[in-house]
């Protein structure tokens, strides 16, 4: 709405599609001001629409016990596989997937029995992503992130710890 005093109001009444990987869209509304004797001038009313983003909160901290791996052989009283959840607040666009940040390096410097750990991602038909960590040919852990915000971590092999440390 443009008022006679030159002020204007823009009301967004629903979501607007943005270009892929774009967080804002600029709409330029050309306006003409004309006076009583017909003189006119033009300008543009720029309206920037910022795309809201989803937020992730309440990420469950999980803990597994390496000494309960079958190959280690302790009392098997603690889990080596555990489920967790996180909460997502969606913006006007629905969340279509959850996966690890490709620019992050969560296993950098991680070793299992002296061998560097590498992480491989698999996109599954159900929309989940599975991350398999290996050291050479040995499985170290698997992380599956599901489309509903739940995840499962399964420890499959030992992880090297700092001297005199039991936790990583």
Briefly describe each language-model feature range.
Residues 1-168:
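Acidic/polar, solvent-exposed loop/turn segments
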């Amino acid at each position: 709405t443009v008022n006679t005093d030159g002020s204007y109001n823009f009301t967004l009444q629903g979501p607007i599609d943005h270009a892929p990987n774009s967080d804002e869209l600029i709409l330029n509304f050309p306006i003409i001001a004309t006076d009583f004797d017909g003189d006119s001038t033009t300008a543009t009313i720029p309206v920037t629409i910022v795309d809201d983003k989803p937020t992730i909160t309440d990420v469950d901290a999980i803990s597994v016990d390496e000494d309960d791996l079958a190959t280690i052989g302790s009392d098997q009283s603690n889990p080596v596989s555990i489920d967790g959840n996180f909460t997502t607040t969606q913006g006007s666009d629905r969340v279509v997937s959850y996966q690890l940040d490709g620019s992050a390096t969560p296993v950098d410097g991680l070793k299992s029995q002296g061998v560097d750990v590498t992480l491989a991602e698999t996109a599954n038909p159900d929309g989940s992503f599975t991350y398999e960590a290996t050291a050479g040919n040995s499985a170290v852990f698997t992380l599956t992130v599901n489309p509903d915000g739940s995840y499962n971590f399964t420890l499959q092999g030992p992880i090297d710890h700092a001297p005199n440390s039991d936790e990583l």
